[in-house]
């Protein structure tokens, strides 16, 4: 259809130097007012001009057909959406679009397209409610109210189905946990919890042998993060507890810092969940994982003039002093196409000197895009 062509921003229609611009709020007006607008004939080759002209012709035709309100409503909604996407002044096009939608809601409340219009209003309100803006007055609860109204008044309609999906996304539980990659052993540390639609979380700290790290966290064919969670749930935790989060019923994302008591030296996974069994049920429950080291050791890598050399300085994490006689093991991860997973190979080790310096020559002649080298300080 011609409208679909002109609605496509990627169409190859060339534009004149003084291209037609949708720069007046009158284009958001009623269908009757819109079809009466005199477009500038000098801009006949402009893409936006041709699109508006087609919308004028279509709406003029639909306005004469009193027996097909749905067709008129559908064309009018698409016209409003086109104007919004191509409106010159981006500062007020959102507000003009919202006002136009509210007008369409009243004008077409007695036809099925009214449900689609309601959904567009609910979706707009929900998106605006997510914005961190001091002048923002929209709330997700308003969007839910419009959805409930639509589902009640237009059951089985496309708009009602869209509203049901929007409600599910609004009620969806989000949860994540982040910490520093390395913390000092036996010292309390902070974690950032990001959440939505959650008031209480359950946490546990699981020790992970570094040699089993790749086996536990690798995802093979047909596996998902759920499989990682199952493997971690099979390991006895060193600690479990629960914590209440700051309550909020606004259906928005929030974050808060929590304190976690110190852990012994080692590598760990911390699981956070909305249920004490740490199991996933899409949308209804959530589980998140983060990993960290508890170590007194830190390091600084050095750019080597020789690409085959690994160079670094091993330091005490507390005072920054060099650590002598620290063992550094070097590894290569190479993707095995037959097994469809990365295979880890130890390449040797080296010991830091009095300045904490470590250097190890690693041949890269057999490496590829699907191979990488790394190290572990012990």
Question: Where are the model-predicted features located?
Answer:
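N-terminal, cleavable Sec-dependent signal peptides of secreted/periplasmic/extracellular proteins
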Residues: 1-378
